[in-house]
Amino acid sequence: DGTTACDLRYRGYRILSGKYGLSGLPAVYGAEKEAQTLEVVLEDGRTGIQVTLLYGVLPKYDVITRSAQIINTKENIIYLEKAASACLDFVTGKYDVISFYGRHAMERNYQRIPVSHGNYVIGSRRGTSSHQYSPFLILTEEGTTEDAGACYAMSFVYSGGFQAEVEKDQFGQNRMLMGLQPEQFSYPLNTGEVFVIPETVMTYSRNGLAELSQNLHRCFRNNLCRGPHKGKVRPILINSWEASYFDFDGESILKLAEEAKELGIE
């Protein structure tokens, strides 16, 4: 009907053993003994929009995950124009925001700036996350170092377009948000259809950035990675590009492989 308003009201909740899964999307996993799921159901009675907020709790990593499922329960088509999986508000405090940018041959450069009034936004419109900007943000208290101070992280488990934001309002309150890239995004949600927003992994440390990184390392290594090499030493791969660039032929590649074998490269 042309309106962009949505008045979501609380309808109920469930607490389940184990970590929720996301059909068709990568997500952190967890068995019944190591994780719990909280489902919070919200509904707009007029538009028929129903939203289920999904929280996954993994205490041993100090990690909480967030996703959401949006359902259209009415006959009209609803167009989704913006969809974020996580949003945190910080009522008081002065913070810095840390993000990582890059390009070819210079990936993942560290950038830390004070959060000022207005909206700080990074993202990707390419359809991929890439090394131009990582789908990852850290909000730290002023003065936080590797070993001391409070900090919060959001990591988007999605390799497509994304948008991450940190905003300070007129009262000095800060908001941190992670979700899908809204530019050129308009998804028609038909009657009974469910739209699942990719997952954001959140963690907190009061002992500096090193502990924050370690929380994510342990969670991703043990509860996100899959496959036969999980928990094992990986085979070593020789990189012919750095060795030869464009100056190679069959003979030079065979010589490189023979020398690599002598060094124990599989």
Predicted ranges, named:
Residues T203-N215:
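Short, Lys/Arg- and Gly-enriched loop/turn segments at beta-strand edges
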Residues A83, S159, V201-M202, I238-A243:
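Active-site beta-loop-alpha junctions enriched in small/polar residues
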Residues N215-E266:
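An acidic-aromatic substrate-binding cleft motif
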Residues A68, G192-E193, I238, A260:
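Conserved, mostly hydrophobic/aromatic
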Residues V166, L180, N207-L209:
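Conserved mixed alpha/beta catalytic, RNA-binding, or beta-rich assembly cores of soluble enzyme
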Residues G172-N190:
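Short acidic, Pro/Gly- and aromatic-enriched capping/linker segments at domain boundaries
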Residues C6, Y187-R206:
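Short Pro-Gly-centered flexible turn/kink motifs
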Residues D1-E167, E183:
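Polysaccharide-binding surfaces and accessory modules of carbohydrate-active proteins
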